[in-house]
Amino acid sequence: MNYHISDRMASMRPSMVREILKATSDPSVIPFAAGNPAPNAFPVEQVQQIVGQILAERPIEALQYSITEGYPPLREALRQLCASHYGIPMREQDDLIVLSGAQQGMDLATKVLCNEGDTVLCEDPSFIGSLNCFRSYHVNLVGVPMEEDGISLPALEEALQREKNVRMLYLIPNFQNPTGITTSLEKRRELYRICAEAGVMILEDNPYGDLRFSGEAIPSLKSMDTEGIVIYVGSFSKILAPGVRVGWTIAPKPLIAKMTVGKQCADVHTTILTQMLCERWLATCDLQAHLARLQEIYRQKCALMLDCIDREFSPKVTHTTPQGGLFLWCTLPEGADMLDFCNRAVAEKVAVVPGVAFLADENAPCRSVRMNFSTPTDEAIVTGCQRLGRLTRELF
């Protein structure tokens, strides 16, 4: 049978990252293309204990329907966490709802703010999951080039003047996926001013902010939001576990009201059992000690990968030096064929993600690849960098 596919989905393709991971599911392939937290980062025993307690003490509440906005004790815990830990006080103008993972925040923000043909600006490169979300709403997706301290402000101003119906700017200010770049405080203040003057919303995605292993923490854009133009999205995926699928968003109340309606249509509410797990975990864990442990795991793994790259790779290959997060960005020399390099890497049993997957314009030229240091073992990092190093020295 010939099935009719909607215009909205006919042009959509699977994430290149997912396709690469599928193609390299062979356990002998070293997964530099992945983006998962380190397996030893999960507080498994705590989760087992908390879930057992919840099901023993409050089984019906955990398994029953609930309200779309989120489990009330978790919402209150998140308000307190945002104020005390993230420096984001709950202003009178704002409200908070629980999400089924941070990805739902991108979907709901786009659904609420954008009509077909409206413009969404994003860092170029940017997170492929969000890019595909924006594309699914048939917006005009425009990338703004990145610099070593965040998005290019002259290019942002030029895009705001050039493009029509710009509804929002999507940013990952901390340890950006895929580059590992962090937006400086000065640049955050200035891009906030630019967007406020232009009347453009900022969608601030902060899944990696707690994974800082060097340097000083930088205030979020939401903490500066006196004009009500920032939608902030947080997540438990990198600090607890991605499998719980719990995130949250703080946004102006009129937008939260519409996002709640959109969420009702999408999934009714986030799973109550995992919301209860997150609330009790926040109440019982030593969060600062837990985060310090995660930061040390990723500090060591990142340092190992950087050391191996500097030792093994051709000096013509450059890379970012992240202060946190899970990723770094390697750029091949002028004239290099990035896709050929990625295919040769797979032949050497090492998977990296071609940088073109992260561009707003998938046909634009790109000489970079994303490398992940959180998923592979230390031994795999060393072996994988040795294999890629030989390849870079042969080619460049």
Language-model features: locations:
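PLP-dependent enzyme catalytic core of the Aspartate aminotransferase-like
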Residues: 1, 347, 362-396
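N-terminal small-domain helix-loop-helix segment of the aminotransferase-like
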Residues: 8-101, 108, 283-284, 351, ...
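Helix C-cap/helix->beta junction micro-motif
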Residues: 27, 137, 197-198, 228, ...
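Conserved PLP cofactor-binding pocket of PLP-dependent enzymes
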Residues: 29, 207, 346-370
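Conserved core of the PLP fold type I
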Residues: 61-198, 203, 209-227, 298, ...
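Conserved core segment of the aminotransferase class I/II
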Residues: 226-296
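Conserved glycine-rich beta-strand-loop-beta hairpin in the small C-terminal domain of fold type I
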Residues: 279, 296-306, 318-331
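Conserved PLP-binding catalytic core of the aspartate aminotransferase-like
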Residues: 316-349
